[in-house]
Amino acid sequence: MAEASQLFKEFKIQSVSEFFRRNAAMLGYTGKVRSLTTLVHEAVTNSLDACEEAGIPPYIRVEIEELGREHYKVVVEDNGPGIPEKYITHVFGKMLAGTKAHRNIQSRGQQGIGISGAVMFAQITSGKATRVITSTGDEIIEAWVKIDVDKNEGKIVKKEKHPNPDGWHGTRIELEVKNVKYMRSKQGVYWYLKLTAIANPHAHIELIEPDGKLIVFPRSSEEVPEPPVEMKPHPKGVLTDDVYRMAKKTKRQSVRRFLIGEFSRISDKKVDELIEYVAALRLIKKVGDKKVQEQLYERLMKGEVKAVLRSFRGYTKVVKQVAKMMEKPPEKLTWHEAEEIVEAFKYMKFLAPPTHGLRPIGEENIEKGLKGILKPEFVTAVTRPPKVYSGGIPFQVEVGLAYGGEIPSGFELLRYANRVPLLFDAGSCVTTQAARSIDWKRYKVDDLDRTPLVLMINVVSVHVPYTGTGKQSIASVDEIYNEIRLAIMDAARRLQTYLSGKHRRLYQVKRKKTFEKYVPEIARALSVLTGESEEKIREYFLNFIESHFASKEAVEVSENA
């Protein structure tokens, strides 16, 4: 039998970077076309977030240069605020690092992996460092960055500084990557940028394809979205570990002040209520009879906490013990006590979390984006009121519907999460499931596969429940599914009204032409019978027909209004 020391001879601690180097597919780097799209997506996402946080209308330029077979140079440049020199290695060379991953805030990226994952993928396929040119308005920093995968750290292998007389600010990154392919497919870079332009009408996006062709998606709105606001965690959406770790880091003087100051919807009065619930749970757990225990838990769930407490002799002593716990320093809160607090939260009723931190695209901007890129004959948008899922995580659903015009025949679903296009794993996405559940025939769409129709769905949240680290599919959460259905049906009813009016107008045009067809013959006959001029009679009937159908159209317009 081998000794333990021999078995553990190969034991090694693996860094986060090393793990993702071996499992790049988890980040979306799987398949040659998808890998290139993922690379561009990570860079463009960073650029959009940076520009918006600085209040700058984004100007983003993407250039794909073919260097050889399945070998490309990818350049992404923006006019954002730039990156301070000391943060360059952290931004581009360290996994799980960023300005938003640790905060309860809406953002396109959530994990702090994105752009550093792109740098790593370029490095492991080409062996080359990523060139970064950036400035905050002072001197221009040019740095070549690599990732030390063993240490999960970025390192600058070469650096130069240049004067900046024009005060340029922004970031340009150049990544050399192999084993990827540029194609104009619906999973490629062109399609990704087109969809990004629809959901971000305030952005000007340019693409230079490998053949040198320049494609421009001009901005159709000058309104830069307000930067998202960090939101305090809601009691219904936290784990014991969250409370325990936050308590160790807080600067508040007592557990009571900590709960009031660092969670939403908790007041002094709510802490007093929490004390009663924690005390009641402590007492219930001491009851030997399981049946009685279950009855007491049920009463607690109904909010009968005072009655439950009064059913125990000497309950005031336990209440005082819990009240004392609330006044001690948070750093002295034990795991068990944090567990008691979180368990009590489950029985308590709280107001829904505030939703002021959510930043939807907005109905007007959705319509601008769809009109500017797709050129439809009809467009409408619906932004649903904010809701919560999993008890305390706020989210919002918005839908855009575009029909006809330059849209080719066939139904197209455009999926988004926080304005970011989701191009892959559509089958497992809640947006696809909700769209498929709609009976489109009820809304005058008889043959969905032949109808020129585009449905856009955007799910907005501080925490989008993705199905995996690749962030290309949203999990099937009941609350989100139901909101998507309601939004689609609202938009579809508007389309139904438009199509009904269109069909009526076509019918009236056909009737009008039929009447006009017989006017010359009637005019000739009446001219013979009455002696009146044939031209005069014909003009009379044509004017009468025109005025008759014009009045019908006016009535129809006023009814629709």
Swiss-Prot record:
Residues annotated to bind ATP: N46, D78, T99, K100, G109, Q110, Q111, G112, I113, G114, I115, S116, K471
Pfam families, A to Z: HATPase_c, Topo-VIb_trans
UniProt organism field: Thermococcus gammatolerans (strain DSM 15229 / JCM 11827 / EJ3)
Protein's recorded name: Type 2 DNA topoisomerase 6 subunit B
Family: Belongs to the TOP6B family.
Function per UniProt: Relaxes both positive and negative superturns and exhibits a strong decatenase activity.
NCBIfam families tied to this protein: PRK04184.1, top6b
Keyword Metal-binding: no
Gene3D superfamilies given in the database record: 1.10.8.50, 3.30.230.10, Histidine kinase-like ATPase, C-terminal domain
Molecular-function annotations in GO: ATP binding; DNA binding; DNA topoisomerase type II (double strand cut, ATP-hydrolyzing) activity
EC numbers, comma separated: 5.6.2.2
Subunit (UniProt): Homodimer. Heterotetramer of two Top6A and two Top6B chains.
UniProt keywords, alphabetically: ATP-binding, DNA-binding, Isomerase, Nucleotide-binding, Topoisomerase
Catalytic activity: ATP-dependent breakage, passage and rejoining of double-stranded DNA
HAMAP family: Top6B (MF_00322)
GO biological process, any: DNA topological change
Domain of life the protein comes from: Archaea
